[in-house]
Amino acid sequence: MKSQESKAKIVLYIAFIQALIATLGSLFFSEVLHFPPCVLCWYQRICIYPLVIILAVCIIKKDKIVPYLVLPLSLIGLCISIYHNLLYYKIIPESIAPCTTGVSCTTKYIEWFGFITIPLLSLCALSVITVCMILYIRFAGHRRVINKE
């Protein structure tokens, strides 16, 4: 059975790899395939791109505060991604908050296997990163410390 510390290290590496794949994937879609990102995609990118650097630095420095740096960005990105997917799959109408600048947030660029879309890829990436950070907190034994004076 693996120690809690080695489990924490594994989920940290998974989060880093996921953030790296998400970043490279989004750059591939926009720079190589020339798919212009919509407004919501930009907001999700703003949340995902820094995670690669934050996670890499925390892995190198063996910094235990990594979840407290990553979770705010991943949770904000996850909320935006959930909203984007609800719009994309027409669960909520686009008329509630239309994407008026640039490309529509419901534009279909890819649909692998009939259901895997760019917004779904973002949702999965941010979900994996968020779950990894929650598991990291559990495995690394983080406890909330309250200073009593």
Where are these regions (language model features)?
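Secretory/periplasmic and organellar redox-cofactor proteins
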Residues: 1-40, 48-149
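Phosphate-coordinating loops and pocket residues in cytosolic domains that bind phosphorylated ligands
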Residues: 43
